[in-house]
Structures are given as C-alpha cells and as structure tokens.
C-alpha cells in the first residue's frame, strides 16, 4: 500500500524574512515554512552564530540544530556595512508579509 505525504500549504502565498538568531527566531521561520510560507533566511557573510553549533562531521560543517531550524527556507548572506545593503534590505522588507527578528 502506498501513502501519499500530506502537505499543509495554508501559508503558500506568504513571504517571510527571517533575521532571527539562535533558536527562537529560526524555529518560528521553520514552522511558517512547514505551513507553506516562502521563508528567506538572511545571514551575515560569515554565517549566523547558530550555523556551527554541534557540527555533523567536521569542524567546518553545519550543525544539526542549524539544519533543523532552517528547513524549508531559502537563504542569502548580506554585508550590512557595504554600500547598497540597506537598499536591498528595504526592498526585501517591502515585499514581505512577515519579518522575524529577535
């Protein structure tokens, strides 16, 4: 017998920007992504602090917590000190329905 995976996409037309850090913000974004929202995680160039907690295989790998909290997300890095970064953030925020920051 075959089972079809049930997917709840109640938030399929919602765009979320995730500037969250560590557990609370990223977890919120993951839950919204689970419900079908388009979630975009914005990180600094070197990566968020939570990216390297408990690496899977080696010191340079991404941690299991990071992978779990960032499922169903698109990602981008941004250098806030570079000219033009504020314009990019402004455009992203104008296109978003939800902004996560903690």
Where in this protein do the model-derived segments appear?
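N-terminal helix-loop segment corresponding to the beta1-alpha1 unit
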Residues: 2-102
């Amino acid at each position: 017998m075959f089972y079809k995976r049930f997917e709840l996409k109640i938030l399929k037309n919602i765009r979320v920007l995730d500037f969250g850090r560590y557990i609370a913000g990223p977890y919120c974004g993951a839950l919204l992504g689970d419900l079908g929202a388009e979630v975009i995680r914005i990180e600094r160039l070197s990566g968020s602090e939570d990216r390297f907690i408990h690496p899977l295989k080696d010191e340079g790998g991404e941690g299991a917590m990071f992978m779990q909290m960032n499922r169903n997300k698109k990602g981008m890095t941004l250098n806030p000190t570079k000219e033009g970064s504020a314009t990019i953030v402004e455009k992203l925020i104008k296109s978003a329905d939800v902004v996560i920051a903690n």
